[in-house]
Structures are given as structure tokens and as C-alpha cells.
Amino acid sequence: MAIKLIVGLANPGAEYAATRHNAGAWYIDLLAERLRAPLREEPKFFGYTSRITLEGEDVRLLVPTTFMNLSGKAVGAMASFYRIQPDEILVAHDELDLPPGVAKFKLGGGHGGHNGLKDIISKLGNNPNFHRLRVGIGHPGDKNKVVGFVLGKPPVSEQKLIDEAIDEAARCTELWFKEGLAKATSRLHTFKAQ
């Protein structure tokens, strides 16, 4: 299946723009910039959207303007309107279980406590079988500190690693369309920013 919708999860507003929880949106912003496809607000899809063409395939980009725990509202609206199936969707999100500087593709699975993923699974009819781009942000080491951690800004040294991983993920997304998921996954999964 070709990917028809790429989503970057985030919380809306300037106060959240630089927080770890918005790593998915950073990836979409970079992809839109690389492909010269500026995002614009589209209220009927509850988010910022753009359309790109990769290897002849029409692909929609989406950054929801809902809060993270309501991300499924935007994803569900766009998927329904364009008749996009779950396995044609790639969702980029921050990942506590990967260190900064690492990003990985994954198909399906649970939500791992991520409220954005949880809502998307629910709004896609409890179907978790969409692709994910997991952008490593690291873990605070104590589960009671997770909320403050994801809503905090990474130090400059970590931000640099996250940005490098996102840059590689954007390149590997283009590679996915050119040479397939296996090749893109192999390249991305051997990358670690230093």
C-alpha cells in the first residue's frame, strides 16, 4: 500500500511549539519545507495541511490543531474525506523509548501510553494498523516525570540530535517512495545522530 497521508502530532500554540511532544510536527514542517509545500490551516480537517507529490503519488500532510489527546479528530476527518485506509497513513510522534538522535518506522502496535496515538486508534475504528515514525526524545527515568518531560523543551545538545534524526527520517520517507519501505527502514534504523 502506498502512503497517502502523513501526520505529525503536536499540541497547538506557540507555548508548545518547541516542546518534545511536538517532535512529530517538526518532521512534517521539515518535509513540507524540503518539498516546497507550505502548510495552511484547513478548519474542516482540524489542522494545517498541504499536498505533496512523491514519485507520482499524491500525499497529504497534516498537523492537527487539536490538542494531542484529540488528534484522531483531525486524522479521522481527513482519512474519511479522502477514503484513506489505516495502512495508508504514517503518523510521526515523539517516542520516550528511543534516545534523542534515533528515529524508527513501525507498522501497527499499541499506543504505549501516547494519548495522540490512543485517540487516532480509536477514531480509526480501533484499528492500530497504521504506520508510525517514532522520533526518539529519551525518557526522564521516572514515569511520574513523563508529563513534565514531554511538555518541556529539550536542551540544545538533545535538540540537535533530534533535528538530525528528523532530517534523516525525512530523507528516508522520500526513499520509501522511491525504493520501498524495506530499504528506507534499513537505512533509518542504522542511523544514530552523534
From Swiss-Prot:
Its EC number is 3.1.1.29. GO terms for cellular component: cytoplasm. TRNA binds at residues 16, 67, 69, 115. It catalyses: an N-acyl-L-alpha-aminoacyl-tRNA + H2O = an N-acyl-L-amino acid + a tRNA + H(+). InterPro entries: Pept_tRNA_hydro (IPR001328), Pept_tRNA_hydro_CS (IPR018171), Pept_tRNA_hydro_sf (IPR036416). GO terms for biological process: protein quality control for misfolded or incompletely synthesized proteins; rescue of stalled ribosome. The active site is at 21 (proton acceptor). Keywords: Cytoplasm, Hydrolase, RNA-binding, tRNA-binding. The record marks 94 as: Stabilizes the basic form of H active site to accept a proton. It comes from the Bacteria. One of its GO terms (molecular function) is peptidyl-tRNA hydrolase activity. Belongs to the PTH family. This is Peptidyl-tRNA hydrolase. The lineage of its organism: Bacteria, Pseudomonadati, Pseudomonadota, Gammaproteobacteria, Enterobacterales. The gene is pth.
